[in-house]
Amino acid sequence: MIDTVDTPTTRHTVASTALGDLTLVLDGDALTGIYFPGHWTRPERAEVGRQTDLADDPLATEVRDQLVAYLAGERTTCDLPLRLDGPALHQAVWTRLQQIPYGETTTYGALAEELGAAPQAVGQAVGANPVSVVVPCHRVIGADGSLTGYAGGLERKRTLLALEEPAATDRGALF
């Protein structure tokens, strides 16, 4: 959940991308959320602040531009100011997700082992990632290589991994 309710600088806008219209939630000078239509952890309307015009918000425009470039294969990362609120384990998982290189995947079990946490707890933290794509939770797959869980839907996860697959050619398939 986003802990910026009733903050006057909390705002949201919608950005059109190759993955569909994304709701971008910003607070002050930081990105706090990216939500797909039908996203299973989408915050309540009151939690995303006032609506802002994308063209009038430099940070929102920068987020959109970096996401569009990433989805076009022109970037391998997004370099954006983030403010991610959550429990300590979630913070640790989200930090580790940012270290998974473009074109590579890991498993929930491997993350759990690295972090000394239960796989189910790690899975919950991955699923609670408020900034999908920027914090690349789509790079986490099942132990058997299957695509499991993605708040934006498995088809979007498949699309993101397929986008990154050419970078993995020398290392083998992503999934």
Predicted regions, residues:
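A short acidic, helix-capping loop that chelates divalent metal ions and anchors anionic groups
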Residues: 45, 143-144
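Basic nucleic-acid-binding alpha-helical/helix-turn surface characteristic of O6-alkylguanine DNA
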Residues: 1-117, 165-175
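…primarily DNA-binding HTH/wHTH and HhH modules…
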Residues: 145-175
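Major-groove DNA-recognition helix of helix-turn-helix-type DNA-binding domains
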Residues: 125-126, 130-134
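Short Lys/Arg-enriched helix C-cap and helix-to-coil transition segments
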Residues: 134-141
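The short coil/loop that forms the "turn" connecting the two helices of the helix-turn-helix
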Residues: 116-117, 128, 142
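Residue-level recognition of specific faces of alpha-helices
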Residues: 96-99, 133, 159
